[in-house]
Curated annotation (Swiss-Prot):
This is Aspartyl/glutamyl-tRNA(Asn/Gln) amidotransferase subunit B. Heterotrimer of A, B and C subunits. Belongs to the GatB/GatE family. GatB subfamily. Its EC number is 6.3.5.-. GO terms for biological process: glutaminyl-tRNAGln biosynthesis via transamidation; translation. The keyword Nucleotide-binding applies. It catalyses: L-glutamyl-tRNA(Gln) + L-glutamine + ATP + H2O = L-glutaminyl-tRNA(Gln) + L-glutamate + ADP + phosphate + H(+); L-aspartyl-tRNA(Asn) + L-glutamine + ATP + H2O = L-asparaginyl-tRNA(Asn) + L-glutamate + ADP + phosphate + 2 H(+). PROSITE patterns: GATB. Keywords: ATP-binding, Ligase, Nucleotide-binding, Protein biosynthesis. It is an enzyme of class 6 (ligase). Pfam families: GatB_N, GatB_Yqey. Gene3D superfamilies: 1.10.10.410, GatB domain, N-terminal subdomain (1.10.150.380).
Length: 500
């Protein structure tokens, strides 16, 4: 298959070398574990964290005479993912045997798909930035294919000084290998691609995307070239298990290859590993070609065939995906593209926001969710699922501001109380006397006292009306933030003789 270069060289993404500029070319192979209660070809459980070899059937252990039976739910999940990637769904696909020896691969081969995958070409739109002007750039990244395959088991070499152990719990677990085209041109683009892909998978409910549990892993293909020249020799960095590490691995590998080429050397096509501790890649083995695996159709499995009605039935029940949701937030709620992008980045955040925004001003809800809630969660190192402030509680705080019960400053204090102690916002305001002062007489008295105590500031303010804000701040401070800010501002201007 010929590889087509669809990207125009962009100087913003060039890497300066000692002898001129270079361009990095990146392709990704993401292994995403299918969300399913049982494995691809057996009924064994896929539960994470079980005792070693607790979830192993006779099929998974490759016992003689045991035949694989396809899991229909895994097929549906692959089709859903293909639809979410705007990809071509192939109504006929074939499972092949990929032959290689690993101690944790009992069959001596992996059941995968080679020439006839279940999903063909698709695309993902990523957003890269911001640049120095605060602008984001949308970039289309092509998807080459998606195919189903089995995972291998796990070899453990640190349990005994003289022996290695094998855990087959993962053996036979269904994986979707999602292969991008070599359309990525920087580590930032690669990280944005993985983040967007994981978001889509989570929205679809086809993979949980938990890289720390191994349910999403990335193989990164990296090569460098002079801008506009043919693709160079690529190296594959295997099984990188965090988005941050992917970025670091690409940065190091690109620099490594550039240094070799500028010294007159050549790049060996090889498989490499990334060492997070050192931030370096190191050689693992020479890179295999497809013929090294001796692919051939698995004789124990018939071709996988389904009709258009099967696909349409799945398509009809797809959830709203991030790009569509972002477009709706901008169109219907008046949010900025940036705010909408933040809110749809994770399904749980989008769901939380929509619960808060229901029946309320969308922009106000977005500001509170992004600036206050997500800011507090980030500071505490908590995910949105672990927030101590429910959508109902945050919505209650917003309602109290809107009806004039509390000021914006008091609302910040109220949020802190709810975050730390919980409780109903309205009841907290009532019990702690946090209602803002709207009595004009009480506010006027405070304004008069501040003006009388600061004659020098009065003269300065008359010469420079913008200094009236100082008096507003002093009144708010004197009233413990309870005075209605609009009423204070109006009275200060009136007392100082400024026209509205």
């Amino acid at each position: 298959m010929s590889i087509v270069d669809v990207r125009t060289p962009d100087p913003k993404r060039f890497i300066p070398g000692a002898t001129g500029d270079w361009e990095v070319i990146i392709g990704m192979e993401v292994h995403a574990q299918v969300l399913s209660n049982s494995k691809l070809f057996s009924g064994a459980s896929t539960e994470f964290g079980s005792e070693p070899n607790a979830n192993v059937s006779l099929v998974d252990a490759a016992m003689p005479g045991m035949l694989p039976v396809i899991n229909e739910e895994c097929v549906k999940q692959a089709v859903r993912t293909g639809l979410g990637l705007k990809a071509k769904i192939n109504n006929r696909s074939i499972f092949d045997r990929k032959n290689y020896f690993y101690p944790d691969l009992p069959q001596g081969y992996q059941i995968s798909q080679y020439k006839d995958p279940i999903v063909g070409e698709g695309k993902i739109i990523i957003s890269v930035g911001p640049d120095r002007q605060g602008h984001f750039e949308d970039v289309e990244i092509g998807i080459e294919r998606l195919h189903l395959e089995q995972d291998a088991g796990k070899s453990m070499h640190d349990q005994h000084p003289a022996m290695s152990y094998v855990d087959l719990n993962r053996s036979g677990v269904a994986l979707m290998e999602i292969v991008s085209k070599p359309d990525l041109r920087s580590s930032d683009e690669a990280k944005a691609y993985l983040t967007k892909l994981r978001s889509i998978l989570r929205y679809l409910g086809t993979c949980d995307g938990n890289m720390d549990e191994g349910s999403m892993r990335a193989d990164v293909n990296v090569s460098v070239r002079r801008p506009g020249e043919a693709f160079g020799t690529r190296c594959e960095i295997k099984n990188v298990n965090s988005i941050r590490f992917v970025g670091q691995a690409i940065e190091y590998e690109a620099r490594r290859q550039i240094a070799i080429l500028e010294d007159g050397g050549a790049i060996d096509q090889e498989t490499r590993l990334f060492d997070p501790g050192k931030g370096e890649t190191r050689s693992m083995r020479s890179k295999e070609d497809a013929h090294d695996y001796r692919y051939f159709p698995d004789p124990d499995l018939l071709p996988l065939e389904f009709d258009d009605a099967f696909v349409e039935a799945l398509k009809a029940h797809l959830p709203e995906l991030p790009d569509d949701k972002k477009e709706r937030f901008v169109r219907d709620l008046g949010l900025s593209v940036y705010d909408a992008s933040v809110l749809v980045s994770e399904k749980a955040i989008a769901d939380y926001f929509e619960a808060v925004a229901a029946g309320r001003d969308g922009k106000t809800a977005a500001n509170w969710v992004i600036n206050d809630l997500l800011g507090a969660l980030n500071k505490a190192g908590k995910p949105i699922e672990g927030t101590p402030v429910s959508p109902a509680q945050l919505g209650g705080i917003i309602d109290l501001i809107k009806d004039g019960t509390i000021s914006g400053k008091l609302a910040k204090d109220l949020f802190e109380i709810v975050w730390n102690e919980g409780g109903d916002p309205a009841q907290i305001v009532e019990s702690r006397g946090m209602k803002q002062v709207t009595d004009t007489g009480a506010i006027e008295k405070a304004v008069d006292e501040i003006i009388a105590a600061n004659p020098d500031q009065v003269e300065k303010a008359k010469a420079k009306p913008s200094l009236a804000g100082w008096f507003v701040g002093q009144v708010m401070k004197a009233t413990g933030g309870k005075a209605n800010p609009q009423a204070v501002q109006a009275l200060v201007k009136s007392k100082l003789g400024f026209e509205e």
